A protein has these predicted regions:
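Short linear "hotspot" motifs
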Residues: 1-214
Length: 214
């Protein structure tokens, strides 16, 4: 419940003066996750799951056996199927002393190549009573010591975006090469009769096979 004496969260023009305009950048911030300073954390108001990418988890040097295995599929991340390694709960610290909030967050750990280290979803933002502004690249949330602002890193957001474009382009190129290889294989198939007296019975084999093998 919001107290009547709690200050309102507002965004002003001066909050955006530090940014380069105009922009369509995402909100990318730094959080303390499991006591590790974690940069390149994407704030996603549309994501339904808190994501921690496995390379980041690995760098934390946390025992993999602490992960809880789950059968929940994650089949639509960035339009690509991803491998769900497991789930784990970490304490996340938002803000800086004294206006900081500690929150236990349950992460899905996924094995996927990403320029981000983690993604924070909208239910977690709601539990923090956080308000975001994509124009100001800012997250503000109430604390008992006043309103805390976590500013987005515009440069990091642009670097992550460009890096993801490269990854997506590489994946598309791989898919195109796979289709070309498959098409080439189909073209070199030829009909071979199984029974000489019955031309209707035949199979398809590669035309590059040796005559004796045929």
């Amino acid at each position: 419940m919001i107290r009547e004496d709690e200050p309102a969260i507002i965004f002003m023009d001066e909050d955006a003066r530090r940014l380069h305009h105009s922009h369509d950048d995402a909100i990318v911030i730094t959080l303390a996750i499991a006591n590790y300073t974690t940069r390149r954390v994407l704030i996603d108001n549309e994501s339904s799951a808190d994501i921690l990418f496995y390379p980041t988890f690995h760098k934390m040097r946390i025992n993999k056996e602490l992960l809880h295995l789950t059968n929940v599929p994650l089949i639509g991340f960035g339009g690509t199927k991803v491998l769900l390694v497991g789930t784990i709960s970490f304490l996340v610290m938002v803000g800086s002393y004294p206006r900081q909030i500690n929150k236990e967050v349950n992460f899905l750990v996924v094995n996927y190549s990403s320029s981000y280290n983690a993604i924070i979803r909208w239910p977690t933002l709601n539990s923090l009573r956080a308000t975001t502004s994509t124009y100001h690249l800012s997250v503000k949330l109430p604390t008992k010591y006043g309103i805390e602002e976590v500013q987005g890193d515009q440069l990091a957001a642009r670097e992550c975006y460009l890096a993801m474009l490269v990854v997506n382009e590489q994946m598309q190129t791989m898919n195109i090469e796979e289709r070309r290889t498959l098409a080439k294989q189909i073209k070199v198939l030829e009909d071979v009769s199984l029974v000489e007296s019955n031309p209707g019975k035949f199979t398809k084999i590669g035309s590059s096979m040796r005559e004796k093998t045929k």
